[in-house]
Regions:
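A generic N-terminal leader/anchor concept
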Residues: 1-64
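Amphipathic alpha-helix face/heptad-repeat signature
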Residues: 14, 243-246, 270-277, 300-307, ...
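C-terminal helix-coil-helix/basic helical segment that borders enzyme active sites and/or dimer interfaces
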Residues: 26-34, 262, 276-325
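Glycine-rich flavin
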Residues: 38-48, 52-151, 158, 358
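Buried hydrophobic positions in well-ordered alpha/beta secondary-structure cores of metabolic enzymes
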Residues: 73, 150-152, 180, 210, ...
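A short core secondary-structure module
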Residues: 153-189
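Glycine-rich beta->alpha junctions and the first turn(s) of the following alpha-helix
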Residues: 195-279
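Glycine-rich phosphate/cofactor-binding loops in nucleotide/flavin-utilizing enzymes
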Residues: 322-362
């Protein structure tokens, strides 16, 4: 596998350096979608290419890429394989949270996470999503014996049957929360079978359950505190990376239309309009990453969602009936685009997308 790596073996998130990796991911995206298998080889390729080191500073063993450069990398990766890119967001979110903590456990695990020899994922969605309306935490933490006792479950953990570690959030009865790093072979931790999804089934996302799981003090990454995710590096849900993945998927879909437009002049204008919109969204994304105020992150997320859905459906229309046959990339992109309507989607963004779909937008 020739990834055209520099002398240190670590690829930077630039187009020339990532080209070999993204071509490999793109070639495997269709078979991965069809099989629903865990992308072992793709994740290994990313680890060997140094992708995990983008997210951590050199003082902790990474290369400390800027937020804008990381988003540039995500734009390329998601245009190649959304399933692999989504998995990376969860793994690197966990990695960044581990690297930012002063917990005693960090030094024992960080290098293996950076190299991809060990994998960690996030179990935090229940702290911010719809389960909150139940009034009772679905994953509780009870103080005792110098640590905490966890009971309950985390409903959406990506790669749960394959990861070595989980960064998990739990809530104490008084409303404070903790983040902890636990090995998946810890007594009392069990994994449900992954949920079959409309797309991205290969992410093997499912529930992880905790039955009287003892957490020692040295495994507490953050907390106890109220809203432990607020300001937590790498542990927040959603964000600009989600918009980057949607814009990257749109890039791939528009590319299909552009291919068809070479021999069909009626597709030239739609392809050009969508490409221009995608370019503006990309520039606004990178502007936000560098402190610009071209728009709000929420506004960009709504636009990115819309662009992903419209461009993928336009690609399906452009390739006609062939795109409706199982295995065609246009059909896969249509299904994958719908993921952005439900993945870490803030309510104002949901409302904006609903208004557009119902022709209620101004």
């Amino acid at each position: 596998m020739d990834l055209t790596a520099p002398s240190d073996g670590i690829l930077r998130p630039t187009v020339p350096e990532l080209m070999g990796l993204t071509q490999n991911l793109a070639a495997q995206a269709g078979p991965l979608d069809k099989s629903g298998d865990w992308p072992t080889h793709q994740i290994r390729q990313c680890g060997q290419s140094g992708v995990f080191r983008w997210f951590v500073g050199p003082e902790r063993g990474g290369i400390g890429c800027s937020d804008a450069d990381i988003l540039r990398g995500y734009l390329q990766l998601s245009a190649s394989c959304l399933t692999t890119s989504f998995i990376l967001t969860q793994f690197t979110g966990a990695l960044r949270r581990v690297a930012a903590s002063g917990a005693a456990i960090v030094d024992r695990v960080l290098e293996d996470l950076l190299s991809g020899q060990s994998l960690a994922s996030l179990g935090i969605s229940h702290l911010t999503t719809s389960h909150r309306h139940l009034g009772k935490s679905i994953l509780s933490a009870k103080p005792g014996d110098g640590g905490f006792l966890l009971n309950g479950f985390s409903p959406w953990v990506t790669g749960s049957p394959h990861i070595d570690w989980i960064v998990v959030g739990a809530e104490i009865e008084d409303g404070r929360q903790i983040l902890a790093l636990l090995p998946m072979d810890h007594p009392g931790i069990s994994v449900d079978p992954p949920t079959r999804l409309m797309a991205l089934t290969g992410s093997h996302t499912g529930a992880v359950r905790f039955d009287q799981v003892q957490v020692q003090a040295d495994a507490i990454l953050a907390g106890p505190e109220e809203q432990v995710l607020v300001g937590a590096t790498g542990a927040s849900t959603g964000g600009l990376q989600t918009s980057a993945l949607a814009i990257g998927l749109a890039d791939s879909a528009i590319g299909l239309i552009e291919q068809q437009s070479v021999t069909r002049s009626d597709l030239v204008e739609p392809a050009n309009r969508l490409r221009a919109e995608q370019n503006v969204a990309r520039e606004d994304l990178l502007s936000l990453a560098t402190g610009g105020q071209a728009c709000s992150p929420g506004e960009l997320r709504g636009r990115a969602n819309s662009l992903a859905i419209r461009s993928s459906q336009a690609a399906l229309a452009a390739v006609k009936g062939a795109g409706y046959i199982e295995g065609h990339p246009a059909g896969r992109l249509c299904r994958e685009a719908l993921f952005f309507l439900v993945w870490s989607c803030p309510q104002p963004v949901v409302a904006a997308n609903l208004c557009e779909l119902a022709s209620l937008s101004e």
